[in-house]
Amino acid sequence: MTATALRTQINWWRGCQRACDRTGYQYLHRTNRTASKEHVQILVLGGGSGGVTMGARMKRKVGAENVAIVEPSEMHYYQPIWTLVGAGAKSVESSGRPTASVIPSGVKWVKSRVTEVNPDTNSVRTDSGKEISYEYLIVALGLQLHFEKIKGLPEGFEHPKIGSNYSEKTVQKTWKALQDFKEGNAVFSFPNTPVKCAGAPQKIMYLTDAYLRKTGKRSNANIVYNTSLPVLFGVKKYADALWEIVKARELTVNLRHNLIEVRADKQEAVFENLDKPGETKVFKYEMLHVTPPMGPPDVLKGSPLADEAGWLNLNKETLQHNVYPNVFGIGDCTNLPTSKTGAAVAAQSGVLDRTITRIMEKRQPDKKYDGYTSCPLVTSYNTVILAEFDYNGQPLETFPLDQSKERRIMYYMKADVMPHLYWHGMLRGLWGGPGPYRTLMHLGMK
């Protein structure tokens, strides 16, 4: 090859490189940036009960291709059944299914965690760096468990005799502690924060009592329920019934006691008397069930969507955001002044579905959520008090009988009917709570 030909080839190669820099390389980076941005008509944050339910409802409204759900978890759990898992009546495996199996078919699953919400630009950002813009946003992020706010936890769970029905990682530890119980105190806590399913901390107490009686250990046990609340239950009708059970079964209830420390190596739980700040009492335990402090998701706290306490700031009747009209919410992450339960989510879903329809039609919402929620208070291995009530703490019962009484049929509903209704009705957007049936059963009088 001559020198002239060599120079020509080198110049040609350099020209190709410059062209590649100007076109191919930049094009690749442009497409990468483009690929990191997406747009969807309806974006759902969270793939728990509220998120999947609304995803299914929105799919029918605008088509699956126009809906996306952001959720990082591989597994989806029916958490209400964990009360029975902790008492050995159900398996933890029966409570979970792969998230992929519950995401509505055709709806896009963004398997990431939301790290930033920007309602002023109608966009969110995920931990993978992806930016997703939306026309309508449904926030269903649930709440956070804060075991770490109790000194000695979560590392204390490495020791036996301590469990919690609030996590799939710790619920089986409750059952193990119950089985291994020999004699002494069985202690149960309720934190000084909002919680999901406010009845659950005492349900496991009643089941522990029943188990110890069944196994002949009850005479060696002192069962203690320490709650931060000033009442046993928030609705007087059901609280009165529960106090009767507490007295009949010789259970100890200490109001306004908040768990602040667990000394797992010594089997000691330290509670603060909230009526006398700074005053503490140490309880030795043979078994300890911890209900952790809870709070709003970090991504909400301090965001424009949150109220002063960090919860999603909603109109309590329409479930529309109080500031951003194209933002809506459902479930545990909201500031709705009602008990955070799956039953509440079901009732909210029907109202929210209607609200979004009206907003899309540029009309005012016309359906109102009354705060309906339900708590099946498990009182033994075959009885339940089915508490149902509204925003005002007034009973809103479905059946034409006194639901403050323990009933076997209600246990059957809790253990078998409600899980089926959840998986096959609610998550498919087909169950919006018992409202219509309540009206029917009460002959139109409720």
Descriptions of predicted regions:
Residues 68-70, 110, 138-139, 187, ...:
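Hydrophobic/aromatic beta-strand patches that form the interior of the parallel beta-sheet core
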Residues 210, 345-371, 377:
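Internal hydrophobic alpha-helix adjacent to the cofactor/substrate pocket in enzyme cavities
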Residues 386-446:
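C-terminal auxiliary extensions adjacent to catalytic cores
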Residues 363-364, 370, 379, 388-397:
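SDR active-site lid
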Residues 146, 155-182, 284-347, 357:
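FAD-site-proximal beta/loop scaffold in flavoenzymes
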Residues 2-40, 107-216, 278, 289:
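FAD-binding core/adjacent interface of flavoenzyme oxidoreductases
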Residues 35-108, 192-236, 443:
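Beta1-alpha1 glycine-rich phosphate/pyrophosphate-binding loop at the start
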Residues 64, 105-117, 124, 132, ...:
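A Rossmann-like FAD-binding core segment of flavoenzymes
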